[in-house]
Amino acid sequence: MRKRFEQQLSLGVLPISEVKINTNSRHQLPPLLKALQHIFTTPDLNKAVFDLLEKELMSGKQKTGRFGMNLWEILVLGSVRLNLDADYDHLLDMANEHMALRGILGVGQSDFTRGHEYKYQTLVDNVCLLDEELLRKINTLIVEFTHGLIKKKEGVADLDLRMKVDSYVVEGNIHFPTDLNLLWDSLRKCLDMVGHLSNRGVVLSGLGKHAYWRKQMKSLYRNAAEIHRKKGGNYKERLKVSTKQYTKKSDELRDKFRSAVLVLQQMLEKGMLDLRKALFFKSLIYYLGKLEKHLDLVKRRILNGETIPHSDKEFSIFEDHFQWCSKGKMHKKVELGHPLSIATDQYHLIVDFELMIGIGDAQAGRVIGGRIIENYTSGYNLESISFDRGYYSKLLKKYLEGHFEKVIMPKRGKKTLAQQAEESEEGYKQLRRRHSAVESNINQLEHHGVNRCPDRGIKNFRRYVALGVLSYNLQRMGNLLIAEERAAEKAERIVRRAA
């Protein structure tokens, strides 16, 4: 059971609306806290955000039982984690020790009590409840509200939007893959599962000395890997000899694991494995599959001299969804993760984003363009949208030209006379030059943690990216609110001096 938020005020504890935030600091946290405070104290926005949180996190749940972390705390802590690019230990320390953050959370301490203290596992279990679709909806609300502030400031009814779309790679938290080290990863994880089962009283024939097997296999892996790394005289012959020894022992171990799986399957059918043992057995089957795959790849590439097709390769046994991304950049020839396309406006807000998993640039442009047209029609003029050459698609450009006044999408390769004339227009060239501003937005987004994702699994990867985008936009909203406050204070000082 969860509640939206109920601040139990005690003596000396300030309401969230009265929490003082140091807006003179240039640190990234105060603007975020300012934006969160504004969400909480603005009735319409507060209701819209909490309605979304309540619908996604509490639908189908009973209204009885123990209270969990409330919805407001989940949103605040998730945003702060990405704003600071923090791990959960850092977040725990901030949640328990940072006075302004605790004030926004509604658990501020007083002279008489320290107040509520969070636990590590509580943060881990609750922040991960937010999913990509929920965060995407909240992000749209925040962008629309911030645009409303800009409309009020500029005194316009409809806002002209000039969009810029670009992509970069969000990396995963994995080591650089080779077929040799992926085979070793598979071997050691199989041995780990056997070790866990052995420690719980499951005796498997031929695998009693799993620690010895681990030491022996690591030695064989290191010998082959060092020859591969250092090269030297007769490199290919020496590598083949070393790899033969490595794969021979791997074959022997694989056969033992196969026999162990058959024994464990019989034990499972007879009800001899408890839940913990059954989970280790399931993991053993998974890692055995990876072992067989990478053992085959090592034999094909090194011993048989085959060129392995890209479709047959995997880049991690733990995160097999990651892509090998090579964008031709000087200092990052290869990145392992997923490309992310973002669309920003002239106010540097990220109005939409799309993780490019199994799709190319042009397809991502179609998805982003479609959502922008759907979400930002009423109260907006879609003035322009710009891309780089990688997004070029004749069909995409034609589709967008039906909704945007100007579409900047340079064509790769040879151009027709009409295309040359279009790209030579002064307005076209001006918007194309302004497109590079999206790079600074990407850089700031990377500083919000969306450069390398530490969370495991594709679902958590998507959530992490969406939370980073939301945190980025909240900081932009906070900066705008702080600027308005300063302008109002300056105007007030001028009036007082004139009086």
Where in the sequence are the language-model features?
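Acidic, metal-coordinating catalytic cores used for nucleic-acid/nucleotide bond scission
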Residues: 65-69, 99, 385-395, 414
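Basic, short loop/linker segments at the boundary and entry of helix-turn-helix/winged-helix-like folds
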Residues: 33-76, 420
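Electropositive, glycine- and tryptophan-enriched low-complexity nucleic-acid-binding patches
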Residues: 329-376
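Charged, often Cys/His-bearing segments associated with DNA-binding zinc-finger transcription factors
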Residues: 1-48, 483-499
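Short, conserved catalytic/metal-binding motifs centered on acidic residues
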Residues: 77, 91, 119-127, 159-171, ...
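Active-site cores of enzymes that catalyze phosphoryl transfer or operate on phosphate-rich substrates
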Residues: 307-344
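Active-site- or DNA-interface-adjacent structural scaffold in DNA-acting proteins
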Residues: 108-319
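Basic, amphipathic alpha-helical segments enriched in Lys/Arg and hydrophobic/aromatic residues
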Residues: 285-289, 426-499
